[in-house]
Amino acid sequence: MSGFANTVYADLVGQDQVIEILQNAVATTRAETEPINYSIHGMTHAWLFTGPPGSGRSNAAIAFAQALICPNNGCGSCKECKSAANGAHPDVEIVRTEGLSIKVDEVRELLSRVAWAPAMGGWRVVVMEDADRLTESAANALLKAIEEPGNRTVWLLCAPTLHDVLPTIRSRCRHLQLVTPSTDAVAQVLQTRDGISATMANFAARVSQGHIGRARYLATNETVRNSRSTIMKLPLTLQGISSAFAAAQTLIDLATQQATEAAETRNEKELDDLSLAYGKGATGRGMATGGSKAIKDLAKEQKTRQTRMIRDGLDSALLDIATFYRDVMLVQAGAHDALVNKELENEINTMAEKTKPQATIKKINAIMVARTNLGHNAAPLLTVEALMCNLAR
């Protein structure tokens, strides 16, 4: 990674091959004449970044956007790079959905915004962080724009896997697959860039399994570490139906608490800003036209966002629990040296002795099914209760 220090790619851990492709694409644009010939050089009008959670697919897309509009090919320090990263550059649109899906009306509104030529004379870049959340009608609306792009418009789509994006869209994109960084690489980044102790960095990197954002969050937040500790002990409490329901409620409570705390400050600031814009303190006729509706719309948006945050929190918790059973399976296979949860080694060994590998595999599969169901908008409490009952068997 040393070769990419002090550039927009500095935070992409273990993605050297992807970075080199992006750097080459940016370099070819500097020598291009109008119109851009996408068929010959490394640049193209649509890119699809895929990779597991924590691989940095969104960070890679945003870094590429910065490099395209940067006069120095992505220095990371100029005003263009900084404004693009913050979503404040007029030619860089970063689409982040706060809800469970991206609807067709949102895509149509986006298309109307990006239809104009670049304001600064370079590129107009659209980063869509959650392309996998496009509804079918929204994806079809986006397809037309990708099929007939402006000469200086670049689409950067992000999704966990190729199969999370419609075939008609992915076939028109250049695909870049990011990988999960090694735990050693993540630990090194936490130490050198965040000043975290070696012990804490190694722990956070190990239990996050290479998810650098999650690792940093764990390493710097004691409350999050305590919540994870509670979650990791839940499998040990599953002795029957009543304990399964209690464990499910604990998961729901923890996810709700974390989502509420994370959203509280942001929600308050958004409401204050909106109230100020429409005449703070005024009511009824004293409030600017549309103010009441805007506040109601904001409340609805915030509720949707919190719902997604709860689901994301549950998904993260289920992944953590899956690592417990993964460790049990490794011990049952005789591999004691590759445990994720070394702090629970005694408990893992005990469960490995009491259960069979086939049962462990079924439990891991049940967790993955529950995660899929949550992603498909299943009721969180019922989904988690059913899962805990399966794990208690």
Spell out what each predicted region is:
Residues 1-66, 83, 152, 160-317, ...:
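Charged, glycine-rich active-site and insertion segments that engage polyanionic ligands
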Residues 65-76, 150:
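Post-Walker A helix-loop "phosphate-sensing" segment adjacent to the P-loop in P-loop NTPases
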Residues 74-103, 164-165:
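AAA+/P-loop NTPase substrate/partner-engagement loops
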Residues 115, 140-157, 167:
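Conserved catalytic/switch belt of AAA+ P-loop NTPases
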